[in-house]
Amino acid sequence: MHIISKAPFEECARKYPNDALALHSLYRVIKETDFSTPEEMRTAFPNLDNFKYRNKWYVLDVGGNNLRVIAYINFVNKRFFVKHITNHAEYDKLTRYYRENKE
């Protein structure tokens, strides 16, 4: 898939060095694999889940469930755009924000 920017992965790896290896691994697998459907992506990432407050946004757990990647994924055009990489406390705040501020 085409990852729009590597910068969020690099920034998060600096911020959370204990999870840097997991972030780089996630980046590499997504970049090297063309997933056609969410179901196909779940074979590599069983924790992939819909982010129910935005269309085509998905959540991936990273680093033994320490971090969450929220991304817009277009499976037809093979595009992966990171919206947020954050810890669980921030994820809860973002979920609350998006729940209260519909598109």
Curated annotation (Swiss-Prot):
A molecular-function term among this protein's GO annotations: RNA binding
Signal peptide: none
Entry EC no(s): 3.1.-.-
Keyword vocabulary terms for this entry: Endonuclease, Hydrolase, Nuclease, RNA-binding, Toxin-antitoxin system
Keyword Mitochondrion attached: no
Designated name of the protein: mRNA interferase HigB
Pfam families linked to this entry: HigB_toxin (PF09907)
InterPro entries: Toxin_HigB (IPR018669)
Described function: Toxic component of a type II toxin-antitoxin (TA) system. A probable translation-dependent mRNA interferase. Probably counteracted by antitoxin HigA.
